[in-house]
């Protein structure tokens, strides 16, 4: 896809009508994807969570989520459909989460990312996330380590 696709990009709060498209993105993006049922529960019933989706021509082509835990946020997932990667959608989703975290007065954001996922790690670093630790054998599909990344926010 070309970067001209971003002209039609909208980042909105995820709603029930986006779940089917998001489930497709989830299944194409993760080795152990969340089920449609888990996605529905998160989007509709988790009062401590906020989810955004990236829409192009009304179709959800990416999504991102964050849980609020006290005064911190934990980024749960960021995923973009393979046909729409590398054109800035992931960055737009990170920006939406950062803006939301700041509007809630959160002091920090954290996330886990596969040690091998250099593309995602470089996006997070671009936005000021730093390596803060490691979870050994965190991912059950291949026992890969997770890098814990943190970003302190201005309050």
PLM feature segments, named:
Residues 112, 125, 130-146:
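Conserved catalytic-core motifs of GNAT/GCN5-like acyltransferases
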Residues 4-5, 13-83, 87, 94-96, ...:
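Acetyl-CoA-dependent GNAT
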Residues 75, 109-113:
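Conserved hydrophobic beta-strand within the GNAT/NAT acetyltransferase core sheet
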Residues 80, 114-115:
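Short amphipathic helical patch at the helix-1/turn junction of helix-turn-helix
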Residues 94, 116-120, 137-142:
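Short glycine/proline-centered loop/turn elements that form peptide/ligand docking sites
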